Amino acid sequence: MGERAAVGYAMNLYVQSFDAQAGAVLKMREFDHPAIAQWLERAAQVNPSSSYSLMLASRVFAEMASDANSRVFLDLVHRHFTARPNERWVWLSHAIFVARHFLQDPELARHYSRSLRELTDPAQVPRWARQMEVFLLVEQNQAQAAQLLVAAMLQSGQIADQQELELLTQRLSEGRSQGDRRSQEKTLTSR
């Protein structure tokens, strides 16, 4: 391990142990999140071959911070993902999960999922990760947009496997059925 890698890991370990200072245990929500984000940023710059900072940002701090601070950590992950997408897609996929389920921000989740789909090499990233955008569109009752996206992915060669196409087609069909049921329920409740 080189000197830069050792310094990067030491910085990450310092940040990771930030909740135990001089014998006092702090609650994560009480942390100085902007300072932690700066430490993680510096550690990622010092040791760019490590994803440890991105793991801490997406798995630890983004899940525990307030919404505004969580977005700072997720943006850090997204920025570093764009530099090495095929190596860092795992952390962006978790950022998508946090944006969707912790922040309840489907637009941010779709933004990240679009980056994941557009910037990664299909040969190096699992299909499920590259399909997240389609699933998010279906979940948001945007089946037509999801259908157009699947057609574009098919035309561009991003979908080459028949089973993958069948899975996406089935998911689109389920999404349309759910959307139809929701529309009927709204109509009935508005009467």
Label the model's feature ranges:
Residues 1-47, 149-151, 155-156, 169-191:
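N-terminal alpha-helical interaction modules that lie
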Residues 28, 62-65, 100-101, 135-139, ...:
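Hydrophobic/aromatic side-chain positions at a characteristic register within alpha-helices
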Residues 30-34, 48, 64, 68, ...:
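Soluble non-cytosolic domains of exported or imported proteins
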Residues 40, 69-82, 105-120, 142-156, ...:
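Alpha-helical repeat scaffolds
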Residues 54-132:
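Alpha-helical adaptor scaffolds
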